[in-house]
Amino acid sequence: MYSSATSPTPIATRTALRPPTAAAGRPGPKQVPPPSRPAVPRGADGRSADARGQAARTALGLRSPETAPPATRAPGARIPAARPGDGRLLRPPMRPGQPAVQERIDPSALQTPAVRAALAGVSRICPAFTPRQVLREGSRHILVAGTIGRAPVVAKCLAPQAVRSEYFEQLVADFHHEVAVYRAFVRHRPPVRLPRLVAADHDRCVLVMERVPGRPAARERHPVNAPTPGEVRALLTAVRTLNLWRPPTDVFQPRLDYQLEIARYHSVGQLTDRDAGDLRGLLHGLGHGPLQLCHGDALLSNMLLAPSGPVLVDWEQAGWYLPGYDLAVLWSVLSGDTAARRQISQLAQSGGTLARDAFLVNLVLVLMREIRLYDVPGAGEEQRIMIRRLYDDAALARRAVRAAVGTR
């Protein structure tokens, strides 16, 4: 819910795709290379390269250049530019239409050493904070619901045991970034709903936010049951509204070095020589295009369905990306909803050829990350099914990239 759904390892940022500001690195996932899959030989399926490219475009919902209508934009508008969650949820999910119940203080959950240490940090900045319920106690973050007076709030703290994590420095950097993002939103209000900042302690990694009524659009990173079509439309509208927002360029920073990401996945065998060359070719054409403000972790678990509309939470990865990064994340986790994927693909290409190419670059890198997160030894049957689906999606995205390169 409010805790981060990704925990990449730190990387050095050296991309030329950035607004005029210093770049901030986006970490990569834990280096556990998946078993290499043999590349399908060209023509092995009995179809020509053009036929396979057209099939990939069709499956992704992308029209061929000959049939695609010209891009339409509002006057003056620019081209729109996992880990599996750790910790344990201590509150059962609320089903749609289920009435809210009175929350009671759970003394046992509030008395664990980690929670007590977190509450001590919260009390330093909010002495009036009254804890009510532990929403999540994980190895990286602790979430405690409570009140300040009559106002419901949520306190998010870095877990004490995170000090022993090999990614501790990156966890601290991400937490500091999220605090900075919430403070920036106080000065530059975004056009989407998000929890209001109540208080923050940058040094102790404590963040107190308004508690928004609602339920997550999904509990899992890759949900089996997708939201309803109406909910999907509302979520996509919220994401696109954020992506089209143009705050001052010095308020946020780039969060992903695309060239370095391509090189990293290429070095571990997830991308072939041709894959890496095709992606670099698309990147070359996007080198001088605008970047887009993205949430950076637009999973369904980071979106609340509230009575007033969708609410976006967990802003640790917010920043400048190539256009369509949030759409690529949503496409990757909505494998069971063909209609939603079609909507996402249509939105991705609505900005023209450059927006389509940027979406494809994002999609391949996001799928490589998901495969790297889940394709690990000891996976259960359900996870192996999901891994096979991710490999199929990645092959589809590769073919679409090759088709896009062929139209340049």
Residue ranges and their predicted role:
Residues 2-9, 13-18:
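Low-acidity, Ser/Thr- and Arg-rich intrinsically disordered low-complexity segments
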Residues 157-198, 225-238:
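A conserved alpha-helical element in kinase catalytic cores
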Residues 215-254:
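Conserved kinase catalytic-core helix
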Residues 2, 57, 61-65, 76-132:
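Juxta-kinase regulatory segment immediately upstream of eukaryotic protein kinase catalytic domains
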Residues 324-353, 363-380, 393-394, 398:
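Active-site activation/catalytic loop segments of kinase-like enzymes and analogous catalytic loops
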Residues 113-126, 244-295:
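An alpha-helical support segment within catalytic cores of ATP-dependent transferases
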Residues 136-155, 281-325:
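Active-site acidic catalytic loop and adjacent metal/ATP-binding pocket
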Residues 204-216:
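Conserved short submotifs of the Hanks-type protein kinase catalytic core
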